[in-house]
Regions:
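C-terminal outer-membrane/trafficking sorting elements
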Residues: 655, 701-753
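Sequence-level preference for short, compositionally simple segments enriched
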Residues: 289-639, 646-652, 658-698
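Short, surface-exposed alpha-helix to beta-strand junction/turn motifs within ectodomains of secreted
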Residues: 209-240, 268
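Extended, low-complexity, turn-rich repeat/linker tracts enriched in Gly/Pro/Ser/Thr and Asp/Glu
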Residues: 89-91, 100-107
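Extended extracellular/luminal ectodomain segments enriched in beta-structured repeat modules
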Residues: 87-96, 148
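Surface-exposed, low-complexity/disordered Ser/Thr/Gly/Pro/Asn-rich loops and linkers
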Residues: 37-89
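Terminal, low-complexity interaction segments
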Residues: 120, 124-186, 265
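Acidic, Ser/Thr/Gly/Pro-rich low-complexity segments and short DxT(G/T)-type signature motifs
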Residues: 188-201, 253-254, 264-289
């Protein structure tokens, strides 16, 4: 047995091969800045290959130890393992591990190091003494490799050594656990971080009223203790990820110039070299016309079922006017068709489970994304399909949950989940089949396994902002131009492909500032970003992606002999902000079609929402922008009041059990049955499409105040029980709000006869 004991600070990176995994295996242990490190197997031409997984969990190891076995059937000794680590914070670097073989192998393997991936230095040789015998090794690297920001290591056959085995080309060389260690020691260059870029740009007049200031530096940074930014008189808390610092802000005013400031010395590198100049950025949120206030047209379940809501929207006479459907928290099932059927793969007829939207301008608004779950009813009949068990209505256009037809343009979804009823691994279980144009999804979730979302209009434009798209196989696929802004892509299980774009309108699938996560850790290093569904037309571009679960090193996959117009990335990073190595990304599709998998900075910057979707002035980001949060919220007994806002369509008033009611006035009387002094109540503002934003809370007062005998009210205002102001002298049950000279207000509920 061979045992190594290290302090956590010694590790640069390591693979113990305990958990399953082969082909572009992420490091099992790593130091800061090495969370993007992978171990790969290459052939003599540098192409990536897989290996036989001999991990402890997958195979019980190889001859008593976990490892990775080559097991290729051609080119004995032509394949080699390689990795690249960031050793910029380490000196006295060493690599240790073990190797063995079975069946056939060269008996000596060299361990080599390189600073550029071209010129290699042999640091030691592993001479294996017979089949099925582990040989341990430890090699110290020369000082020239100290503090190397890019240090490559490879394990390659010494073809001058003897071979052992049956004489065939089947290679049984096995790599055991690897530990790359060093002595932590940063190199202090004495230079402060340099600000390379920032958002919004200086002088920008198109910023959001709620967003974030983004500062990008030339090296990894940290904030000085207590350092904060300042904007509109408010202190902004920083968030640091690698080389980037962000400052979230909210509730700015449209069309008003602001200046963000950050004092000198607030940002420093990891050796405490601090910036010497203050940062100042002037920008102006875009202008926006005031919006008309209106209540929801249909509330589910208050006004009826989900089927009733869709029927009402479809039956309205004026389809140019937006119809807003609101769903309280709950689970809802679209009804089966009463007169249409679909033929299952078993040849039988089943009631059509798909709901069809044929009219434009409908908003589907939920109380909360997790709280509102909408699905359909599919038969629970499973057959043996081409790729395993499959629902009889699997397939595009058969068991879809929701289908937007060509005329259903301008539909809007927010704060809800559309979910497949088929279950995982039951074939193509489409949640949204979109044949329309200008659909917007904001902070919503599409939940399925394969072909979750199908953009089905070559001339269509579609926009996603925030929210979750979940699946395993081609779970965003199809035609047209789709802009995914800050969406969380959730990868299910092992393997799979996120996207399968086909024919674009012009720009294809653009993923900007998105995040990729695994439903479990099994996804890490085992999926790809997409594959081309077509010949020479598919486009998928990932820009500024945070890959909490990393794809395979090659990044992309083949599909039915197709090839892309472009499948590429820019600035893909790990959760810690470590840049992901894109040099191994797939460059050839269908054997002969070249692909440049890396975007330039200028290319990436061009793909804005405006450039991709705004040819006719369509601005989905402004449409989806959340209404300003409520300000001035106060409680006067049963009555809540707050500042009016002309960019809010309505307000939702919330109690401890959810939404109590809605209003288009900046006040609301809580019904007696829902009121309790001391409880917390909240108000949420809706944007022009009806989507609700964050809740602002207040603690309710009793409404009974002591008033001294010599105090006189300077103002008295009367309201009815609906919170609408009425004239003095009105009859009925009224709310009297008195304001006194000292600023106090007293609210009294009274009966006026």
């Amino acid at each position: 047995e061979y045992t190594g004991i290290f302090s956590p600070g010694d590790f640069i990176t390591a693979w113990d091969f305990y958990l399953p995994g082969a082909s572009s295996r992420p490091a099992d242990f790593y130091a800061e800045d090495n969370d993007a490190t992978v171990l790969i197997l290459r052939d003599a031409q540098g192409n990536l290959s897989s290996w036989l997984d001999k991990s402890e969990q997958a195979a019980g190891g190889f001859e008593g130890r976990p490892g990775a076995t080559n097991w290729t059937t051609a080119g004995l000794g032509s394949y080699y393992w390689q990795t690249t680590v960031n050793a910029s914070a380490f000196t006295a670097i060493s690599v240790e591990g073990a190797m063995a073989y079975n069946f056939n192998a060269y008996t000596t393997y060299d361990v080599e190091a390189s600073l550029d991936g071209t010129e290699w230095t042999k640091i030691g040789s592993v001479k294996i003494e017979g089949a099925k015998k582990w040989k341990d090794y430890r090699f110290d690297l020369p000082a020239k490799f100290d503090n190397a920001p890019s240090l490559s290591l490879r394990w390659i056959a010494d073809k001058s050594s003897a071979t052992d085995g049956s004489g065939s080309e089947k290679d049984g060389i096995t790599l055991g656990a690897i530990y790359i260690t060093g002595t932590p020691k940063l190199v202090n260059d004495g230079t402060a971080p340099v600000l390379l870029s920032y958002v919004p740009a200086e002088g920008s007049d198109n910023a959001s009223i709620t967003g974030k200031i983004v500062l990008n530096f030339d090296e990894k940074v940290k904030m000085a203790a207590g350092a904060k930014g300042e904007l509109a008189g408010a202190k902004l808390e920083p968030a640091v990820t690698g080389k980037t610092v962000t400052f979230p802000y909210k509730n700015l005013a449209y069309g008003t110039e602001y200046t963000f400031t950050l004092p000198a010395g607030a940002v420093m590198d990891l050796c405490d070299n601090a910036t010497t100049q203050a940062i100042s950025i002037k920008f102006t949120p875009r202008t926006k016309p005031e919006i008309e206030k209106a209540l929801y047209d249909f509330i589910v379940p208050d006004d009826g079922t989900i089927g009733d809501a869709v029927a009402a929207a479809e039956a309205r006479e004026d389809v140019t006017k937006r119809f807003r459907i609101f769903f309280r928290n709950g689970s809802y099932v679209f009804p089966l068709s009463a007169d249409k059927t679909k033929t299952g793969s078993d040849g039988k007829e089943y009631a059509d489970p798909t709901t069809y939207i044929t009219t434009p301008n409908i908003s589907f608004i939920g109380e909360s994304t997790k709280g509102v779950v909408i699905t359909n009813a599919v038969p629970g009949v499973v057959i043996d399909g081409q790729y395993g068990p499959a629902n009889v209505l699997e397939g595009i256009g058969k068991g879809d949950v929701l289908r937007l037809e060509k005329k259903a343009t301008g539909c809007y979804f927010q704060n809800l989940t559309l979910k497949s009823a088929m279950g995982d691994s039951r074939g193509r279980d489409i949640v949204l089949n979109d044949n329309s144009d200008k659909t917007i999804f904001k902070d919503a979730c599409l939940w399925a396994y394969q072909d979750t979302y199908v953009s089905n209009n070559e001339n269509g434009r579609f926009y996603f902002e925030g929210g979750v798209l979940r699946g395993r196989t081609d779970y965003v696929c199809g035609k047209g131009d789709v802009y995914y802004q800050a969406v969380n892509f959730q990868v299910v299980g092992e393997g799979g492909y996120i996207s399968a774009p086909s024919k674009p309108k012009q720009y294809g699938y653009i993923f900007n500032e998105c995040e990729i996560t695994g439903e479990t850790s099994a996804a890490n290093g085992k999926y790809t970003l997409g594959r081309p569904w077509g010949s020479g037309t598919p486009i998928a571009l990932y820009i500024n992606t945070v890959m909490k679960a990393q794809p395979k090193a090659e990044g992309w996959n083949e599909m039915s002999g197709g090839w892309p117009a472009r499948m590429a990335e820019y600035n893909s990073v790990t959760a810690a902000g470590t840049p992901i190595d894109l040099s191994k990304r797939k460059k050839i599709f269908a054997q002969t079609h070249e692909n440049n998998p890396v975007l330039t900075k200028s290319e990436a910057e061009w793909y804005t929402i405006e450039n991709v979707l705004g040819q006719d002035g369509w601005d989905p980001a402004m449409t989806a922008e959340q209404a300003p949060e409520v300000t001035g919220l106060k409680s006067e007994g049963y009555v809540l009041s707050w500042d009016n806002n002309n960019y809010t369509s309505l307000w939702a008033v919330c109690g401890k059990n959810g939404i109590i009611g809605f209003t288009t006035e900046p006040k609301f009387e809580i019904p007696a049955a829902d009121f309790k002094a001391g409880d917390t109540y909240g108000v949420r503002a809706a944007n022009e499409m009806g989507g609700l934003g964050a809740q602002v809370d207040v603690t309710a007062e009793s409404g009974i105040s002591s008033v001294t005998a010599d105090s006189e009210a300077v103002s008295t205002v009367w309201y009815n029980l609906q919170g609408i102001r009425v004239a003095e002298g009105a009859k009925g049950i009224l709310i009297k709000v008195e304001t006194f000279a000292d600023g106090r207000t007293v609210t009294t509920k009274t009966v006026v006869e």
